[in-house]
A protein has these predicted regions:
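RNase H catalytic domain
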Residues: 11-15, 52-136, 140, 144-147
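RNase H-like nuclease fold core
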Residues: 1-45, 56-59, 138-143, 147-149
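Short, conserved alpha-helix that lines the donor NDP-sugar binding/gating region
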Residues: 47, 51
């Protein structure tokens, strides 16, 4: 069975400011684009929201749930958070190493729930480097940001 390939992106005009998120969920030759935005948000919130929406589509599509998933993301914050930092945050009661509450905790908890229920491999891709689906996500993000300006 082919794996599901995902690309995500999130961004803001100002931080905080109007923001957008986008994802592309690819199953063989079928690519599904999703996007949304918010009038007042942060870059990191939009990056997390993109990943949550992508994994939600997969989780809620029965034929996808048992498949391997490759998430390509240009956010080191999300990639490192979900693959490394989150296990320590949970052990520490959602506190960072410096004993401060984890920023965007609710979003991290949503992402963790989906990530734990699926077979996900997280890969970092360089943003604005000509990676086709990453560029599509970036363009969709910009359209969403412009709706809220």
């Amino acid at each position: 069975m082919e794996k599901i390939v995902v690309y995500t992106d999130g961004g803001c005009s100002g931080n905080p400011g109007p923001g957008g998120w986008a994802c592309v969920v690819i199953d063989g030759d079928d690519a599904r684009e999703l996007s949304g935005g918010s009038r007042s948000t942060t870059n990191n919130q939009m990056e997390l929201t993109a990943a949550i929406n992508a994994l939600s589509v997969i989780y809620n599509t029965p034929r996808f749930k048992s498949r391997k998933i490759e998430v390509n993301i240009d956010s080191q914050y999300v990639k490192n958070g979900i693959t490394s930092w989150i296990s320590k945050w949970k052990v520490n009661g959602w506190k960072t190493a410096s004993k401060k509450p984890v920023v965007n905790q609710e979003l991290w908890q949503q992402l963790d729930k989906l990530n734990s229920a699926l077979d996900v491999e997280w890969k970092w891709v360089k943003g604005h480097a000509g990676v086709e689906y990453n560029e599509i996500c970036d363009s969709l993000c910009q359209k969403q940001i412009n709706l809220f300006k």
